[in-house]
């Protein structure tokens, strides 16, 4: 799989998780077979850019390429500036967070709360893509509320804006992490757009990884919670996908 000019070593990606996927954890996951990893989200609020937390999250020293920095916020201009800052800081890919379901993030109209305003989504996508000369990716969910899934429109608009790849968690914000991931909609998105689609949600075993890839036709899978305390899951999945056998 390619993200812009960058060919990943495989199609297994570490999902961005605030407070979890710091640089040491990303490095560990890559050591155990992940082909790519996305950073923890970093706020687009420039007044917080020099905080201890922000500086720690923006430390990519020694990280294996390609380096992907995720940004979060709701103002298109602020997000564009944050993207430029991360590129100057060493990021080779910028990821926009429209998937975080956390209350404190959504209360600021960031993360998955953005899915309530498709016009704002479009402005953010256009502005950030135009702001940097590196690939811009999007991480998102099916929609904000159950019964109001708007991911097909958002995915098409992302492709039109020049987004290089779309990572999709198969739940709405209302679902949080309850119910089951809806791979049927991920499959529809994959059939709708031509850019790479990354399937996310409930992938916790080699068998599940193969099923999701086969069923959705996704270009890659993204694993988050299942990698906590078990970063070698990437090696297990890669071996199973390549041989049909367990390590």
How would you name each of these model-derived features?
Residues 1-247:
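Flavin-dependent oxidoreductase catalytic cores
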